[in-house]
Amino acid sequence: MTAYILRRLLATLPVMAVVAVFVFFLLRIAPGDPAAIIAGEDATAEAISAVRAKLGLDRPVLEQFALWLWRLAQGDLGVSIFSNLPVTRLIAQRLEPTVALTLSTLFVAVALAIPVGVIAAWQVRKLADRLVMIFAVLGFAVPGFLAAYVLIYIFAVQLQWLPVQGYRPIAEGLWPFIEGLILPSIALGVTYMALIARITRASMLEVLSQDYIRTANSKGLATRRVLLLHALKNAAVPIVTVIGIGIALLISGVVITETVFNIPGLGRLTVDAVLKRDYPIVQGLILVFAAAKVLVNLVIDISYAFLDPRIRY
């Protein structure tokens, strides 16, 4: 197992290198000039050129890339063009809200979707199953930002049960912290819940058709025991796989969700940096997102060995 983990970690290096090259040059060919934004709308060409020289943007692109790679190899993601603060510090300051939102969404989605999928498989072609399939279709069809605005309108504007926007750190109290995450977690997790519920249903249906499940039922074992100890355990690998894929989608989805709910996390920082053409922040954030996705995939692959004894690395 240790050798497999080391091989996977080494295999991530080329992936991260490709991401770094792609991000750097894509930003350079994208329209917009951070020097022009800093200089202002009425700035002269000479003023803009002076700002570009100060930022080092007047150097050849390959020279800029080599300098950035050298700093990156030393763990330095650079300095923000606008705030003049280290990118690592900015990311660290915004990390807590994003991690809290991602974990809360993951908890809500898994806690709701897996039981729903199991019930749908057990009650196949009955009312419960049809309701779950309708929810799955709607979950895939409704965009996350639309779900966010609908939830805000119903539960924050009309019913006034929850705050419209805003994130409260856990240091300010547990309930304000949870209260600020309820709507964003549901909005971000709608598609995720639909995906997990549908895969859980499909995987459970396949397992429930096996002979050993019919044998367990014929012996008079309790339905809960059959479903949880025999069926769900053997259906876990596909479910865990889709949970891992969904986490990668959640990491990308926080950009829109944090913007809608005004959460000061990495997603909001990404939007602000892209609009300002703050190259160091965008480059650093995309590398962090890519590394998180690679790490999640590694954890999911390792979990297979614990879920299925037949899998060995």
Positions of PLM-derived features:
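Alpha-helical transmembrane segments of integral membrane proteins
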Residues: 2-3, 13, 92-130, 144, ...
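Hydrophobic alpha-helical transmembrane segments of membrane transport/permease proteins
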Residues: 15-66, 82, 159-180
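Membrane-water interface segments at the C-terminal ends of transmembrane alpha-helices
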Residues: 22-29, 59, 70, 134-165, ...
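Short hydrophobic, aromatic-rich alpha-helical segments embedded in or entering the lipid bilayer
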Residues: 43-76, 182, 213, 262-272
